[in-house]
From Swiss-Prot:
Pfam family, any one: YbjQ_1
Similarity comment: family membership: Belongs to the UPF0145 family.
Protein name: UPF0145 protein Cthe_0398
Organism: Acetivibrio thermocellus (strain ATCC 27405 / DSM 1237 / JCM 9322 / NBRC 103400 / NCIMB 10682 / NRRL B-4536 / VPI 7372)
UniProt xrefs under InterPro entries: UPF0145_dom_sf, UPF0145_YbjQ-like
Domain of life: Bacteria
Length: 106
């Protein structure tokens, strides 16, 4: 399956629009990661624990979106957008949403 942020796929023709498709992942951030990230921020550099959490959440949202597109009979997703949102009273949850248009291409 082709998944792209563009509104079309070069050399391919959209023959059917199946509809909007989304995937969502909500992930909690724990105390140890917060502490490690705080040390990283204090000493400078990148927080590998948070980066790993972001990558895992993004890949999960894309995977879920892809599975839903397959269920709709699509073989591609165009116009993909990925959004990140911090949730919870203490900002201790991360929501990643991937959305796009499920299509059939040839």
């Amino acid at each position: 399956m082709i998944i792209t942020t563009t509104n079309g796929i070069e050399g391919k023709r959209v023959v059917e629009y199946k509809g909007i498709v989304c995937g969502e992942v909500i992930s909690g951030v724990d105390f140890i990661k917060d502490f490690a990230a705080g040390l990283t921020n204090f000493f400078g550099g990148r927080s590998k624990s948070y980066e790993g959490e972001l990558i895992e959440a993004r890949e999960g949202a894309i995977r879920e979106m892809k599975e839903r597109a397959i269920q709709m009979g699509a073989n591609a997703i165009i116009g993909v957008d990925i959004d990140y949102e911090v949730l919870g009273q203490g900002g201790n949850m991360l929501m990643v949403t991937a959305s796009g248009t499920a299509v059939v291409i040839e």
